[in-house]
């Protein structure tokens, strides 16, 4: 399954592992993964949560409190590697199922967020519900960000909002009067050139 993760998903899993190690926790749990999604550099999950009408910062504070409450280990396992707990694995399995229903070829961070929203057993799912983050709102926010694009590469997050970032909406500029009035008036410009070029 790991070969079907996007780069940002792999990065989030690695960040979750790093956070669990840093805090000397007994295992890597779903809460570590969600914290990694919230703190990921240029992450998509905070944008989706904010567009869904909640505060990603408020959720982050709740998750940090939950991480602080987890028990710590006095020493690391013999092999030095922490184990992923069952909930962590279940979230990834659920995310894979969600990716399949959206006809995406790779498991991306938005699929993991949707898996957390669907999960009513964890405190994360309950917190998201309390703050009004629903599956429909996230799917609408996702449609705003990625349009009708499917996840067909391992780095789709780089393509999201590319048009907004590197292009401009000419129709919107025309409506607001920001567009030069000459644009789109080729016939008028040719007529003026013909008149001016006469002797």
Predicted regions, residues:
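Histone-fold recognition with a strong bias for associated Lys/Arg-rich disordered tails
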Residues: 1-199
């Amino acid at each position: 399954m790991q070969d079907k993760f996007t780069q940002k998903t792999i990065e989030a899993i690695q960040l979750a592992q790093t956070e669990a190690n840093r805090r000397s926790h007994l295992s890597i749990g779903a809460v570590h993964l969600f914290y990694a999604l919230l703190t990921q550099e240029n992450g998509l999950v905070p944008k989706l949560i904010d567009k869904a009408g909640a505060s990603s910062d408020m959720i982050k504070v709740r998750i940090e409190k939950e991480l602080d409450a987890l028990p710590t280990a006095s020493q690391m396992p013999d092999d030095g590697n922490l184990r992923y707990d069952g909930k962590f694995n279940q979230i990834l399995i659920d995310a894979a199922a969600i990716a399949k229903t959206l006809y995406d070829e790779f498991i991306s961070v938005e699929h993991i967020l949707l898996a957390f929203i669907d999960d009513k057993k964890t405190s994360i799912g309950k917190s998201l519900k309390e703050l009004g983050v629903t599956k429909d709102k996230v799917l609408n926010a996702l449609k705003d960000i990625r349009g009708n694009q499917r996840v067909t590469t391992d780095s789709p997050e780089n393509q999201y909002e590319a048009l907004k970032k590197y292009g401009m909406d000419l129709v919107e500029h025309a409506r607001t009067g920001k567009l030069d009035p000459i644009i789109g008036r080729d016939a008028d410009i040719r007529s003026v050139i013909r008149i001016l070029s006469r002797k």
